[in-house]
UniProtKB/Swiss-Prot annotation:
Its EC number is 4.2.1.10. One of its GO terms (molecular function) is 3-dehydroquinate dehydratase activity. Belongs to the type-II 3-dehydroquinase family. Keywords: Amino-acid biosynthesis, Aromatic amino acid biosynthesis, Lyase. Substrate binds at N73, H79, D86, I102, S103, R112. This is 3-dehydroquinate dehydratase. It is an enzyme of class 4 (lyase).
Length: 146
């Protein structure tokens, strides 16, 4: 089983950008953590990051065509991107996706409280730090329809 893990804008800056909110763990650290956990669960993760909405959408389309579930931390696109939601709707109808946020978006600025993606996600994990990625991975493996 393959699971696509997508990280949106600015997540390449993990460990450097606002460490008081996001911690000091880098995206490379997150990828190592996920690969190790995936190996233990007997699955494969493909971890990608882009600062460009269109590239994320292209990757979602590829996952939809392959029938892969997705873990996505959309970053700021959470609150703005109808296009990303429309792409993920196809995953929603298939293998499903889990929305992950390192920080608790509901405890932050008002504009961060709304997610265009949450209503169609299998689940949302927010505020548990990078552990949220691991929890999403475990959920998708345990609840796979394949």
């Amino acid at each position: 089983m393959n699971i696509l893990v997508l990280n949106g804008p600015n997540l390449d800056r993990l460990g450097k950008r606002q460490p008081e909110i996001y911690g000091r763990t880098t995206l490379a650290d997150v990828e190592k953590l996920l690969v190790k956990r995936a190996d233990a669960l007997g699955v494969t993760v493909i971890v990608k990051q882009s600062n460009y909405e269109g590239e994320l959408i292209d990757w979602v389309h590829e996952a939809a065509d392959a029938g892969w579930p997705v873990i996505i931390n959309p970053g700021g696109l959470t609150h703005t991107s109808v296009s990303l939601r429309d792409a993920l709707a196809e995953i929603h109808d298939g293998a499903g996706f889990v929305e992950v946020h390192i920080s608790n978006i509901h405890a932050r600025e008002e504009f961060r409280h709304h997610s265009f993606l949450s209503p169609i996600a299998r689940g949302v994990i927010a505020g548990l730090g990078v552990m949220g990625y691991e929890l999403a991975l475990e959920y998708l493996v345990l609840n796979s329809h394949s």
